[in-house]
């Protein structure tokens, strides 16, 4: 199994009145898993793509058990973990490295949380989350509680804004061995899950954001942090 991105020429060039219409995302922006990859940690390098790249607006394809256990997907997982930690970030979805498949990696390391004050940790309900992989995740909201916090994205670097998310969620998925997993999460971990699974459905955090709060990181620190 090999991985690649594949877009029609007219979409990449912007030719044609409907070349990049989001409503046609499935047919206009096909992504296959049949040819050579743009790179893996064993060879080339998967780079984090930025907002405006059509791959971020696709509905990602599910993976079957054989695909999950293939060398290509295992290499993709390793490369995604590397990119996430280099950024650094607490989660990364496959579309963010240009591969439209239903796969995310998540890790909220203790050293990230140590940068926050005790009050911030408690308010955000943020605890360390060990590295794990979720494939073909299905998320459901539990209860009616929500929380609103500033949120950023590795594909929209340098910006944050307020996003309302469910406080408690349940996720059913497969792990990197194609074994079923069930997660019930609350607080910041629930937010990470919602953010990353949104990516698999062609959604970015700005689609759920209060755009009046959309800020550069500099202005977030200047006007919003702790306010």
UniProtKB/Swiss-Prot annotation:
Cofactor(s) the protein requires to work: Fe(2+)
EC number: 3.5.1.88
InterPro entries per the UniProt record, alphabetical: Peptide_deformylase, Peptide_deformylase_sf
Positions annotated as active site in the UniProt record: 196
Taxonomic superkingdom: Bacteria
Protein name: Peptide deformylase 1
Any coiled-coil regions, as ranges: none
Source organism of this protein record: Gloeobacter violaceus (strain ATCC 29082 / PCC 7421)
Substrates-to-products reaction catalysed: N-terminal N-formyl-L-methionyl-[peptide] + H2O = N-terminal L-methionyl-[peptide] + formate
Swiss-Prot/TrEMBL keywords: Hydrolase, Iron, Metal-binding, Protein biosynthesis
GO molecular function, one term: peptide deformylase activity
Family, as annotated: Belongs to the polypeptide deformylase family.
Cofactor note: Binds 1 Fe(2+) ion.
A biological process from GO: co-translational protein modification
Purpose: Removes the formyl group from the N-terminal Met of newly synthesized proteins. Requires at least a dipeptide for an efficient rate of reaction. N-terminal L-methionine is a prerequisite for activity but the enzyme has broad specificity at other positions.
Positions with a binding annotation for Fe cation: 153, 195, 199
